[in-house]
């Protein structure tokens, strides 16, 4: 009887782990696709064509924000981040850059210039969608009818997902 109880407990534990894995957190790739879908839904709501993701541009964007992941922080000195921006510039050469979102330039507490990731991936809920649409609208960067292409990337730092993108004509 005890063996049957142990076996049942073991099977239930395994089933629970399987369910938790299947219902687990969104991956970076899933978050990226959801963000792109929401950006294009937002653009459709204001009667604009969708932005087409270009793998070359997304790869450049991913490489850029991977520097933050490698450092394990969302803020880098401008000089360090600018090295990554030089590589990004080479990778996106020939594309007509319009604007970017999620990577900011500011002055740190010590007076040095810093670059930081500012756009957290919102929860995959109605509230998260509303938060994202408010950010898209408030930025004014997704409303140009001449923009047709996007490079978009997501990284996880300290358990929080951040995203950035660049928009091109």
Labelled PLM ranges:
Residues 1-11:
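Bacterial N-terminal signal peptides that target proteins for export
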Residues 19-22:
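C-terminal motif of bacterial Sec signal peptides marking the signal peptidase cleavage site
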Residues 6, 70-75, 131-133:
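Charged, low-complexity, helix/coiled-coil-prone segments
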Residues 26-101, 150:
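Short, well-ordered surface patches within globular domains
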């Amino acid at each position: 009887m005890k063996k049957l109880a142990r076996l049942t407990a073991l099977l239930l534990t395994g089933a629970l782990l399987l369910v938790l894995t299947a219902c687990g957190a969104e991956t970076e790739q899933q978050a990226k696709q959801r963000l792109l879908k929401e950006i294009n839904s937002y653009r459709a709501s204001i009667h604009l064509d969708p932005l087409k993701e270009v793998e070359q541009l997304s790869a450049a964007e991913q490489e850029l924000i991977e520097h933050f992941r490698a450092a394990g922080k969302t803020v880098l000195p401008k000089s360090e981040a600018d090295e990554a921006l030089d590589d990004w510039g080479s990778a996106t050469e020939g594309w007509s850059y319009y604007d970017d979102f999620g990577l900011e330039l500011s002055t740190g507490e010590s007076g040095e210039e810093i670059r930081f990731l500012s756009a957290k991936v919102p929860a995959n809920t109605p509230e998260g969608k509303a938060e994202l649409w408010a950010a898209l609208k408030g930025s004014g960067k997704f409303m140009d009818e001449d923009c047709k292409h996007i490079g978009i990337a997501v990284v996880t730092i300290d358990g929080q997902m951040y995203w950035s993108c660049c928009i091109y004509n």
